[in-house]
Swiss-Prot record:
Domain of life: Bacteria
Entry function: Located at the top of the head of the 30S subunit, it contacts several helices of the 16S rRNA. In the 70S ribosome it contacts the 23S rRNA (bridge B1a) and protein L5 of the 50S subunit (bridge B1b), connecting the 2 subunits; these bridges are implicated in subunit movement. Contacts the tRNAs in the A and P-sites.
InterPro entries, per database record: Rbsml_uS13_C, Ribosomal_uS13, Ribosomal_uS13-like_H2TH, Ribosomal_uS13_bac-type, Ribosomal_uS13_CS
Lineage: Bacteria, Bacillati, Bacillota, Bacilli, Lactobacillales
Name under which the protein is recorded: Small ribosomal subunit protein uS13
Keywords: Ribonucleoprotein, Ribosomal protein, RNA-binding, rRNA-binding, tRNA-binding
Region named Disordered: 90-121
One GO-annotated biological process of the protein: translation
GO cellular component: cytosol; small ribosomal subunit
Subunit and partners: Part of the 30S ribosomal subunit. Forms a loose heterodimer with protein S19. Forms two bridges to the 50S subunit in the 70S ribosome.
Gene3D superfamilies in the cross-refs: 1.10.8.50, 30s ribosomal protein s13, domain 2
Designated gene of the protein: rpsM
């Protein structure tokens, strides 16, 4: 099982799909990484040679992935909250950030409805 950036890639999948298991690498990034490393997209993870694994690791090291990327995203959100921007306020209140309406929907972001006990008409 190939291990890249601390993630065990699934053995039975093609390498282009296996790379997407790493946080911060999607389909397009995976294709670019493999092209730069000179590895075919159709190779299964179990069929990679150690040399190919090393080439892929070297290319992936140039990308911001996993812990570094998660840390950067959380710091960006924290900065928005500290400077008091509208987006920061929406993050702090747990509401949608990108201008969506919240009168009817936004349940995913707002969480489960909270009933008000003892309230009758």
């Amino acid at each position: 099982m190939a291990r890249i950036e601390g993630i065990d890639l699934p053995r039975d999948k093609r390498i282009v799909i296996g790379l997407t298991y790493i946080y911060g690498i999607g389909n397009t990034s995976a294709q670019k990484i493999l092209a730069e490393a000179g590895v075919s997209e159709d190779v299964r993870v179990r069929d990679l040679t150690p040399d190919q694994e090393d080439k892929i690791r070297a290319v992936v090291d140039g990308y911001k992935t996993e812990g570094d990327l998660r840390r950067e995203v959380s710091l960006n959100i924290k900065l928005l909250q500290e400077i008091g921007s509208y987006r920061g306020m929406r993050h702090r209140r747990g509401l949608p950030v990108r201008g969506q309406h919240t009168k009817n929907n936004a349940r995913t972001r707002k969480g489960k409805k909270v009933s008000i006990a003892g309230r009758k008409k």
